[in-house]
A protein has these predicted regions:
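A glycine-rich, hydrophobic/aromatic-adjacent loop/helix-cap motif
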Residues: 1-233
Length: 233
């Protein structure tokens, strides 16, 4: 997800690739779990894809991007798979005979800086559980931004733009792709509503509903948005 960037170079990405190949063994098809841009821009040939649920991890827009969706002067944000909760996404199956070649391409895209902690996670699908490669992020990583106040998030959505486009476009693409796959991520929807209310995108249906409700009664409190534990990865 990030291009080579000395600010984020934390380890040689060849080492986790060798470890993952040893775990996979090359004796079967390879599954990959998509939770953000891999859903709407996978860039590899998949023999099959399925909706999937991962427990123990959640999607969060908390990974710093200084190249693809931002700059060193104005870092952007991209989604990461963080510990805790649960996550709905899509698993893709690479055919064994092509998986090694496709894995090289995927690694060049996702792991040029070695910032992720790639691992196999059990993914529940309608046809059973499959072990799938997922790109996770540690809270100890220098790329981890933590939970940002809405004011800071809005500033990033307004101004962060990198070689592949803006953080705002990236978030919108992910939200729309999730909806197309029947996934409603409450935190993603909350951020989309926030962007809509501040005029950054066309107003979302949820944002319009919230706006109407707030004009009807000011005495009824609206429950706060929950964490992303009910959704996807």
């Amino acid at each position: 997800m990030n291009a080579i960037d000395s600010h984020l170079m934390v380890r040689d990405p060849a080492e986790p690739l060798a470890r993952l190949r040893a775990q996979w063994g090359g004796r079967s098809d390879l599954w990959v779990f998509g939770y953000a841009s891999l859903i709407w821009r996978p860039e590899f040939d998949a023999a099959e894809h399925r909706p999937a649920l991962v427990h123990g991890w959640h999607r969060a827009l908390r990974m710093r991007s200084r190249v693809n969706r931002g700059t060193p002067q104005q870092p952007g944000l991209v989604f990461a798979l963080m510990p805790g909760g649960a996550c709905r996404g899509v698993v893709y199956r690479m055919r064994r005979e092509r998986a090694d070649e496709e894995l090289e391409r995927l690694w060049a895209r996702e792991m040029p800086t070695g910032v992720y902690d790639p691992r196999f996670l059990p993914c529940r699908t309608p046809d059973g559980v499959v072990p799938a490669l997922a790109f996770t992020l540690s809270r100890r990583s220098d790329a981890y931004m933590g939970r940002l106040p809405d004011e800071q998030l809005l500033h990033i959505l307004r101004h962060a733009h990198g070689r592949f486009g803006s953080t705002l476009d990236y978030m919108c693409h992910t939200a729309h792709a999730l909806r197309q796959h029947g996934v409603r991520d409450r935190e993603v929807e909350r951020m989309m509503g926030l962007a809509a209310r501040h005029g950054l995108i066309g107003q979302e249906p949820a944002a319009r509903t919230a706006a109407r409700s707030s004009t009807v009664s000011t005495s009824t409190s609206t429950p706060g948005s929950s964490t992303s534990a009910a959704h996807a990865g």
